[in-house]
């Protein structure tokens, strides 16, 4: 990663003995020593507005749009230019990303390979993807030591007065979509929309749906407020809610 100007790494639920050995090895890159270690993918991508999954499509029928690697950089550039943050997600070498992992991805990037030998090891896949991005995004988009799409504190202060209009344009972060998904799931259960046995399937399908809708932060707040209100009414019933305004907002 560091070879291509990328400086922010998050590692999700690593196998501790191997991870500890890698970080403590003589000559271990600063990148590894500064990496975030998180228990779940949802936390790792919470601040990101575009999450890109990686893997070999093969005979699978992908549930997200598939973008060839050479066409990825313009999408990343557009997201950065409008103030978003981008994450690329790589799965474990043995099994790749699971279906559950992919539910947090907006799109899937495919590396062009020989159909007779489509698989690449993890290190190769990371290097090829980051090289392709670095070769097309050289300059301000890949500032050394700076997280992609990060807004500094001084810039944020200067934009305070325009935060509402900015949220109306900025894509909803993965964390915002997760909050919407959680309250919608609760409302579905409270309304007996589907049995609890279907919860795992609903969990997956709902996250894919929210990403296909390409919501803004403003959209996500409104939907969150709406479903919180619906859930409040469902949980309390007509008799308890009369004369009370109930919760509002996001």
Question: Residue ranges of each PLM-predicted region?
Answer:
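Post-transcriptional modification and biogenesis factors for structured RNAs
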Residues: 2-250
């Amino acid at each position: 990663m560091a070879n291509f100007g990328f400086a922010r790494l998050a590692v999700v639920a690593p196998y501790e003995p191997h991870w500890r050995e890698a970080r403590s090895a003589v000559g271990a890159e600063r990148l590894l020593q500064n990496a975030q270690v998180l228990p779940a993918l949802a936390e790792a991508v919470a601040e990101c507005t575009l999450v890109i999954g990686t893997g070999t499509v093969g005979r699978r029928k992908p549930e997200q749009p598939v973008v060839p690697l050479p066409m990825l950089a313009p999408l990343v550039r557009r997201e950065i230019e409008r103030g978003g943050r981008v994450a690329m997600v790589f799965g474990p070498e043995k099994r790749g990303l699971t279906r559950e992992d992919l539910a947090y991805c907006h799109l899937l990037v495919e590396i062009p390979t020989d159909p007779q030998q489509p698989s690449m090891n993890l290190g190769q896949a990371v290097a090829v993807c980051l090289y392709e991005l670095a070769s097309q995004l050289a300059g301000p988009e890949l500032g050394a030591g700076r997280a992609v799409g990060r807004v500094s504190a001084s810039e944020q202060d200067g934009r305070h007065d325009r935060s509402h209009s900015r949220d109306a344009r900025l894509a909803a972060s993965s964390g915002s979509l997760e909050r919407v998904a959680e309250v919608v799931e609760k409302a579905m259960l409270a309304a007996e929309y589907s049995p609890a046995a279907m919860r795992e399937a609903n969990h997956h399908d709902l996250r894919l749906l929210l990403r296909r809708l390409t919501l803004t932060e403003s959209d996500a707040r409104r939907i969150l407020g709406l479903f919180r209100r619906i859930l409040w009414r469902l949980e309390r019933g007509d008799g308890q809610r009369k004369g009370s305004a109930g919760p509002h907002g996001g």
